[in-house]
UniProtKB/Swiss-Prot annotation:
Name of the gene this protein is made from: ERVK-21
Major localization class: membrane
A single MF term (Gene Ontology): zinc ion binding
Assigned protein family: Belongs to the beta type-B retroviral Gag protein family. HERV class-II K(HML-2) gag subfamily.
Protein name: Endogenous retrovirus group K member 21 Gag polyprotein
Gene3D superfamilies, A to Z: 1.10.1200.30, Human Immunodeficiency Virus Type 1 Capsid Protein (1.10.375.10), Retroviral GAG p10 protein (1.10.150.490), Zinc finger, CCHC-type (4.10.60.10)
Annotated GO CC locations: plasma membrane
Subcellular location: Cell membrane
Lipid moiety-binding residues (N-myristoyl glycine): G2
Region annotated Disordered, chain positions: 165-189, 217-264, 598-641
Domain of life from the UniProt record: Eukaryota
PTM notes: Myristoylation is essential for retroviral assembly. Alteration of the glycine residue leads to a block in the budding of particles and an accumulation of Gag inside the cell.
Length: 666
């Protein structure tokens, strides 16, 4: 679509730089990528657009009409193109007059002329009509045949040329004077550009020398000056927070001074702050006063405290974060920590922040833990050597001396740091509605839970239930081993009590348990179960206890204590010692009756019935022995099975009657 970005950038390089500077002075920042996209669309649908660019408002209105027609025909115009077109069109409106036909290629000569020195010599009436720090020279000519493009660069890019050392030196802004349209002194206007000469030569041409200024609402208004980094300002004491750094001032030497307090500028400044958390101002700003104001000569300058409330967007983001993620989610803790350490928050700020973000029940918890933390901190302040002069009223922002915002804004850095630490600890103890804080004894690692997740849960519970930091650290290190699963305990056991000083115990435990529960660890456990060999520094052992001696590693039938007792009993009962080798397994000095080996010395399996006698045939029970019927002709041969059953069926049947008994001869 259209030309490539590189061609567009090289073709309109000068015009793009001018447009960016123009928009920047109006308080709008547009990326080069979006501008290149805009000119790609213009190249496609507006081929008449001049290569040197144009400042004519009619041309930009025509561009808008043709882009709308292209959109009606089905062509896709990105939204950023419409936004950039509207911004450029709005920025060019203040520069137009009734006879506006401004082209960048038609602007010869330098448009930056310092009028301060010459205008001071004129009468007060003339100087009041001058509001020219920098005056615009003629920007209208009928042809471009005699255009000097070196001068053209000075016209459009004075700031760039100054940085490169090619342009004229720019003089700083002078006193703000009423806006006027007085002509330039004749000595400062080039001869070729003097309007009187050109008008006489060609009266049909419009005036070529005039001054133009944007409305006061669009003029750049610098921020209030602040004497940060004053040479006589003492450095911040060690161990305390440094003085707040001043915001970076934008240098705009070519913009004329404008009236302060413009309502539009206040809206623009407010909109800039919204959506950019890094631009949030400190609620309490410290500004050192110059010598002579509140301090005598030779004394360090005093510091003036100025309070500024939170922005509505920041409070809204805090409320949405607490509602969506919870007050103690990682996101909210990180956001709160950045706000607390990036701002100089007084007790009033903490109360407003908590009230606007938390539920009533959560705010009650926060206030309760805040008061408890203040009581503990006051005790530590009194016990310090020397004692710290910070009382409970100051840390809570109450009482006759610390109840107002102006009084709290004068708090020392040490008190601000103590309030920050107390409120952060109180915020961490807030519980979600309907949830209870479990005891650290009940936090145990499941068989499939990763060890870092278990330690994170343990630390979270300990942080909410144990206030003392040293006690919390000891409890976490102890429970990290005691409440871990057996696999992690076996990996941590060699490190327990042997972690070198200066190293974090929990970090070493996490390193030792890295990989437990994974595929590689499961394969190692399976190999240990099959082979029983040492793998990865761990030995496969039997985990049960012997019912005879109570020791771990063998069963009762293999208990060495029981075997020794049996050998002693056998020796005392038989009166003789066991043979040299067992006749059964041939690999131990014990009796064969006590041999429990399953393999002989050659590795062949042994039968468990070796010591028993030969099995005997079952005895017949009944009145008469059953003799099989053998038909004639089959003596000495195996009769057929059918004939055997036939013979059995011919036997007398005895139901419930007793069998006949032989008569007893007397």
């Amino acid at each position: 679509m259209g030309q490539t970005k590189s061609k567009i950038k090289s073709k309109y390089a000068s015009y793009l730089s001018f447009i960016k500077i123009l928009l920047k002075r109006g308080g709008v920042k547009v990326s080069t990528k979006n501008l290149i996209k805009l000119f790609q669309i213009i190249e496609q649908f507006c081929p008449w657009f001049p290569e040197q660019g144009t400042l004519d408002l009619k041309d930009w209105k025509r561009i808008g009409k043709e882009l709308k027609q292209a959109g009606r025909k089905g062509n896709i115009i990105p939204l950023t193109v419409w936004n950039d077109w509207a911004i450029i069109k709005a920025a060019l409106e203040p520069f137009q007059t009734e006879e506006d036909s401004i082209s960048v290629s038609d602007a010869p000569g330098s448009c930056i002329i310092d009028c301060n020195e010459n205008t001071r010599k004129k009468s007060q009436k003339e100087t009041e009509g001058l509001h020219c720090e920098y005056a615009a020279e003629p920007v209208m000519a009928q042809s471009t045949q005699n255009v000097d493009y070196n001068q053209l660069q000075e016209v459009i890019y004075p700031e760039t040329l100054k940085l490169e050392g090619k342009g004229p030196e720019l003089v700083g802004p002078s006193e703000s004077k009423p806006r006027g349209t007085s002509p330039l002194p004749a000595g400062q206007v080039p001869v070729t550009l003097q309007p009187q000469t050109q008008v006489k030569e060609n009266k049909t041409q419009p005036p070529v020398a005039y001054q133009y200024w944007p409305p006061a609402e669009l003029q750049y208004r610098p921020p209030p000056e602040s004497q940060y980094g004053y040479p006589g300002m003492p450095p911040a004491p060690q161990g305390r927070a440094p003085y707040p750094q001043p915001p970076t001032r934008r240098l705009n030497p070519t913009a004329p001074p404008s009236r302060q307090g413009s309502e539009l500028h206040e809206i623009i400044d407010k909109s800039r702050k919204e959506g950019d958390t890094e631009a949030w101002q400190f609620p309490v700003m410290l500004e050192p006063m110059p010598p002579g104001e509140g301090a005598q000569e030779g004394e360090p300058p005093t510091v003036e405290a100025r309070y500024k409330s939170f922005s509505i967007k920041m409070l809204k983001d805090m409320k949405e974060g607490v509602k969506q993620y919870g007050p103690n989610s990682p996101y909210m803790r990180t956001l709160l920590d950045s706000i607390a350490h990036g701002h100089r928050l007084i007790p009033y700020d903490w109360e407003i922040l908590a009230k606007s973000s938390l539920l009533p029940s959560q705010f009650l918890q926060f206030k309760t833990w805040w008061i408890d933390g203040v009581q503990e901190q006051v005790q530590r302040n009194r016990a310090a050597n020397p004692p710290v002069n910070i009382d409970a009223d100051q840390l809570l922002g109450i009482g006759q001396n610390w109840s107002t915002i102006s009084q709290q804004a004068l708090m020392q850095n040490e008190a601000i740091e103590q309030v920050r630490a107390i409120c952060l600890r109180a915020w961490e103890k807030i519980q979600d509605p309907g949830s209870t804080c479990p005891s650290f004894n009940t936090v145990r690692q499941s068989s499939k839970e990763p060890y870092p997740d278990f330690v994170a849960r343990l630390q979270d519970v300990a942080q909410k239930s144990i206030a003392d930091e040293k006690a919390r650290k000891v409890i976490v290190e102890l429970m990290a081993y005691e409440n871990a699963n057996p696999e992690c305990q076996s990996a941590i056991k060699p490190l327990k009590g042997k972690v070198p000083a200066g190293s974090d115990v929990i970090s070493e435990y996490v390193k030792a348990c890295d990989g437990i529960g994974g595929a590689m660890h499961k394969a190692m456990l399976m190999a240990q179960a099959i082979t029983g060999v040492v793998l990865g520094g761990q030995v496969r052992t039997f985990g049960g206890k012997c019912y005879n001696c109570g020791q771990i590693g063998h069963l009762k039938k293999n208990c060495p204590v029981l075997n020794k007792q049996n050998i002693t009993i056998q020796a005392t009962t038989t009166g003789r010692e066991p043979p040299d080798l067992c006749p059964r397994c041939k690999k131990g000095k014990h009796w064969a009756s006590q041999c429990r080996s399953k393999f002989d010395k050659n590795g062949q399996p042994l039968s468990g019935n070796e010591q028993r006698g030969q099995p005997q045939a079952p005895q017949q029970t009944g009145a008469f022995p059953i003799q099989p019927f053998v038909p004639q002709g089959f003596q000495g041969q195996q009769p057929p099975l059918s004939q055997v059953f036939q013979g059995i069926s011919q036997l007398p049947q005895y139901n419930n009657c007793p069998p006949p008994q032989a008569a007893v001869q007397q």
